[in-house]
Every structure is written in C-alpha cells, then in structure tokens.
Amino acid sequence: MTLFHFGNCFALAYFPYFITYKCSGLSEYNAFWRCVQAGATYLCVQLCKMLFLATFFPTWEGAVGAYDFIGEFMKATVDLADLLGLHLVMSRNAGKGEYKIMVAAMGWATAELVMSRCLPLWVGARGIEFDWKYIQMSIDSNISLVHYMAVAALVWMWTRYDLPTHYRLPVTVLLGLSMYKAFLMDCFVHIFIMGSWTALLLKAVITGVLSLSCLTLFVSLVHGN
Amino acid sequence: MLEEAGEVFDNMLKASFPLTFIVFLPAVLLLVSPLQAEAAHEFTVYRMQHYDLQGQSYGTRNSVLNTEARTVQADVLSRRCVLMRLADFSFEQYQKALRQSAGAVVIILPPNMAALPQDIVQQFMDIEPEMLSMETQVPVYFAVEDEELLSIYEQTLAASASQGTSSAAEVLLHTATANGFQMVTSGAQSKAVSDWLVTSVEGRLTGLGAEDLPTIAIVAHYDSFGVAPWLSYGADSNGSGVTILLELARLFSRLYTYKRTHAGYNLLFFASGGGKFNYQGTKRWLEDHLDHTDSSLLQDNVAFVLCLDTLGNGDTLHLHVSKPPREGTLQHAFLRELEMIISSQFPEVKFSMVHKKINLAEDTLAWEHERFAIRRLPAFTVSHLESHRSGHRNSILDLRWKVDTQVLARNTRIIAEALTRVIYNLTEKAAPSDLQIFTQQMQVQKEQLDAVMQWLTGQPRAAQLVDKDSSLLSTLEYYMSRYLKDVKFYHVKADKRDPEFVFYDQLKQTMNAYRVKPAIFDLLLALCIAAYLGLSYFAVQNFGLLYKLVQRVSWKPKQQ
C-alpha cells in the first residue's frame, strides 16, 4: 500500500527479534558475531538442503490442486539437516546451555527472517494493493522465533551425554513433532480447508504448546538433577 | 510506572500462562477481521468517444485515471472514480457526478444487453447523444460486468452508502473491515492520431449500350457510432444498409451477366466510410469524381443516388428527400414504384415520404443524401426511421438482436423490386403491379443476409477503429469484387492545417482495481502493532517469572 504500511509490517516482523536480543542478555555476552556465524551456518545448511532436494526430489507433476502427501513428508524429513546445523552451531560455542541455545536460535531465526521475508515484504507491502498476507507473514516470523528457540533447546537436550534415560523418549517425541510441524500443519490446513487467519492461529497455538512442554522439560532437566 | 505495569503483567502471567499467550495474537487478530485477501482485478475498459469535428471537440478529453472508487451514493465525489451500473444509470446522476468534479466515471454494462428491459434501452439511447454533446474533461469509461467487477461495485456501494450516517467508532471499525478500491488505467494519455485514413469502397456494374448511359448510385456507410467506439457494433445503423447494398450487388450482378437482362443503366455501389462523422468518405468521393477527374460516372448523367440507412427493423419505410421529386424524373418514378410495390405486395409496411430541407447552419448533415443534394445530384435516403435525430442511429445498444433478418430480407426485396421496375421501365411496359421478379432462383437469400450481418456485427466498426489495412475492409473489397467490376478504395485524410476531423487513441485500456485501505487504517494498525510490541517487550523482560513458574509446577510432584 504505502511505505507506512511497509514500516508497520517491518516493525511487526523485526522488533520482537531485537527485543529478544536486547533483553535476553545476549548483548552483554558480545554474542553478535556468534549469532552472525549461526546465520552463516543457516545459509550453508539451506544451500545443501536445496541441492539435495533438487537432485533427489524431482518436481512433482500431479494434478493441480492435489496435495502430494508422500513428497511433502520426504521434504520435511530433509529438514533433519536443520537440526544437525543447530547442533553444529551449538557444539562450536562454549558456554552455558541457555547461552548456547539462545545464540543458535537467534542467529538461525534471524537469518531465516532476512533471507525469506525481507524481499517479499519490500516488494509486496509497498505495492498499491493491500493484502493481509504481509501482516500475517510478519506475525508468522514472530512465531518462528519461538519455534527455533524450542527446537534449539530440544537439540541441546538430546545431544547431552548425561541425559537421563526417562527424558530420552519425551525429548525425541518433541523433536520429531517440531520437525514435522510444518508438514502436519499443511496437511491439516489442506484437509480442513482453513482460512489463512485460522491457520496462523493454529500455528501459534501449536508452537506455544510445543515450546511450553519443551520449557518444562528443560527446567526439570537443569534444576532436577 | 513501568514497574507497576510490569507487576500487573506479572500477576497476569502467574494466573495462567496460556491465557496471556493467547491474548497477544488474538488482540491483533480481532482488530484485523478475517477477510480473504484477493489479488488485484484486471478488466478491459472502453473509453468514451474522443474526437474533434469541424473544429469542435466532443466526448471525453482525458484517459489517465488513478483514483479511488465510489458510487454516486457517496457524499463526496470530488477526485473519485464514480462507478455506475447501466441498470440504475440516469443522466441526472451522471451530471451530478461531473458537477461534483469527479475524477472519472466508469459505467458498468450488463453482460447480456439483449435481456435489458426496453425502457432502460430507450432511456440510454436518449442519453448517449447528450453525453457526447458536451465536452467532458475527466475520463469516462465503459466496462462489461463480470462477477468480480460486480463484487467490487457492491463493496464500493456498501462503503459509499454507509458514509456519514455512523458514529466515530463505527467508522473506525469500518475502515478496518471494508475495502476501498483504487482504479488505475495502464495506458498513456490520449493523443491525436495523425494521418488517419478513412477508407471507402466503390464498385460498379456497367450498363449495356451507348457511352453516356444514366447512372444509379447505391450508397451506404459502413461505419458505426456509439458512445464508446469499441462498443459500437452498429447492427441496424448501418450494418443493415451495407448488408442490403451487398445483396443488391449480388442480385443485379446476376441480372447484368445475361444479355437479355443487361439494362441500360450503370450501377455504382459505394460503401462509404466516416459516415457518422458528417459523411467524410462520401464528401471526398464526390470531390474526387466531380472536381478532379475529367470524366466519371457521377459527372454526366446521374439518374439518382439511393442511400440506404437503418433498414433492419420495424414495419415502416420512409423516403427522406431534401426536395420533393418533380413529376417525370426518374426519382419520381422510383418513388411511385416503391409506393406501388408496398401497397400491392407488402400491405403491412407503412410507407411515407419525408421532406426535410438541408440546414446548412447545423454542424452535421442529417442524412447521407444531403451530401449529394448539396452537389446538385438527385438523391434520397431510405430508412425505417422517421427522423435523423433518433438515438437508434448512434447507440452502443444497436446490437445484432436489433436487426430482424425477416425485415431485412423484406426491405431488400422492396428496394430491389422498385429498382428493377425503374431500370427496365416495367410500368410503362404495362407489367402488373404484383409482378414478382426476385423469386425462386433470383430470390433474396436470407442465409446470405444473416451471414453478412453476423460478419459486420462481429467486430466494432467505429470509424476510429477501421484502419486502411483492416480485415473488415479487405473482406468488403473481396466480397464486392466477386460481383462488381472496378472495385477500388478511396481514402480521406484530414487536412493538416485545418483538420475537419481529428481522432484520438487510447480508446481501449486495461484497468486495474487495487484493494486499498484508507490512511487512518494504517495509523490504527501502527497503534495495534506498537501495543503488541510493548506486550512482547514485557513478556521477554519478565521471562524469568515464567521460568520460575514452570520450575515450581514441575517440581511439585517430586516433592510429594
């Protein structure tokens, strides 16, 4: 619509990241370059994923409007590389668990925000046509910040050598859930033909529940033993 | 103060976490109501006439448009694009919009014009010349309705109608939920087309006999006219005239191929262009024939010129003359034959002669025969209309369904029979008045008429659109050269210094309707986002509380 509208969307998308960085104490650790490194790792991982997908998953030429469940499932499985990447970032940083998790998640999510949402916002939200999808996209970026924090925490817990055996199962289940979250959401939206706002709300709720369970596990793991 | 606010927030967090989490998003979600976001709609619009004739400007003078849409019900129309539907269109509303200095007018035509009630058709036909008679500074466009355009119209109508009657809160809510539309045309500003050629086609059948045989010219202009050039299909005016002209060419070419029926008259067929612009094509044709060449058929011995105009409907026929024919002339003989044939063979047709003197003070000539009468050639026009002022001749609603093929065939027969009786002098040879010549092998072919009509009305034939290489003209030439000899084109170009007619381009454009929101909506959204960011700031700031809460909850079972 106007530059003002772009400003609105931009603020909605980026300020929560800024706030999180400033208030979580990351800025006091001088963690900026570490976050940038995490972002660079994100880029590498995405490149590898794309190469892999392009090589082994030819474009599906099915009927228009149909949903390729198996293909999408396989693609979601490739997202395993994200978990590896997060682990890589965390293993190269020394420090407390929370610090490692925050650096990895912030770098990762910010890199995603810059790479995948900056351009559409710049092109779309400034156009004449008004569309709610840019506001939705900005809200979605906030959700994905929470999502990556939870995933980073889960990866950290899973890779700990001193993880008690009775924690192993819930952590693995949660990891699997968050990895296939996007795929499951897509299926759900497709089957129940949901509007974009309902889908967004559902995504927020699911991410909230996942991160809350993750936080509970984390808290009891850190302070439990 | 911030601490106090923080405390309140802490308490809220302590009460239940999911509640606060769910408060953030729905706060934004509720303010922005769940509307389906649609892409911009793109549709074709046809601009109103834009031309100068004899130094006078007509129609809309502008083609660029970039304004927000409204309907006439809105309070303020200035610099807005006013949408109107043909079904509830009236000249008063149109004038009201222009008086309030509207930025543009878009008139939405129904997709199926044939289904329009007769009174609306009549009303619009009366309005059309009035719209064109005045010069309009803002662009006026016509669009054909489709589902999306109708939905845009209805949303705009709802938004326009609710203005000024609601409270401030309602207005605020309205800005968030309602859609505005920004109408944008993609084309450039209209400019005069230089060196436009108006083309006419001539063909002839030479009579049998000596050098200076009398000539009968049969003339019909092929171009159409309406409030928007791209919508002018001109079925009755003057597709019907051209159809009859071509059928007469076919019939007489058959008569002229046999020596026994080869008459002593030259027949000159002329499909003129620019007929709706004061008969420019005819004017040039006459100048070429009378002033420039040494000998031509029109110079020596012209029996009469028969103009065909608007003959596809109704049970009346009128012979328009500018001077009543004198007794003993061929003109008079033709009139007598017409009367006799109609009274003896087609009693359902009402026939009359209409006498109207040429008014040189008027801007345009009334009928095509006046062009010839000015040059002292005996001429008349046959038409089913009683007056040249009828809106019927200049309407975009003059479509294929306005022409009845039965009537067209009957009129062709009447004219053909009368012409034949004059050419072969049958009355003086004591042929009976109900002698039917064009029957059996020689009969008027309805399929042929229908096909020609279909072809003519298959495309808009406004003078601005038929350029000299257009398929319409080449097909017309091809058709005429099948039956006639010496078929050739005549071109008219307006004088550079003092042009008699000037056409303008950008008559068809693509218009985009962009969904937009008012500026106040952006402010409202900015407030909501600021509130949300404030909330997330507190949430992050006090994350420790959540942490402790979870710690307490998850430890309790173990202590028991």
Swiss-Prot record, chain A:
Subcellular location: Endoplasmic reticulum membrane; Cell membrane
Lumenal side: 59-68, 127-131, 190-196
Keywords: Cell membrane, Endoplasmic reticulum, Membrane, Transmembrane, Transmembrane helix
Transmembrane segments: 1-21, 35-58, 69-90, 101-126, 132-157, 167-189, 197-218
InterPro entries registered for this protein in UniProt: TMEM147
GO cellular component: endoplasmic reticulum membrane; nuclear membrane; plasma membrane
GO biological process terms, semicolon-separated: multi-pass transmembrane protein insertion into ER membrane; protein localization to nuclear inner membrane
Main location: endoplasmic reticulum
GO MF terms, alphabetically ordered: ribosome binding
Family: Belongs to the TMEM147 family.
Protein role: Component of the multi-pass translocon (MPT) complex that mediates insertion of multi-pass membrane proteins into the lipid bilayer of membranes. The MPT complex takes over after the SEC61 complex: following membrane insertion of the first few transmembrane segments of proteins by the SEC61 complex, the MPT complex occludes the lateral gate of the SEC61 complex to promote insertion of subsequent transmembrane regions.
Protein name: BOS complex subunit TMEM147
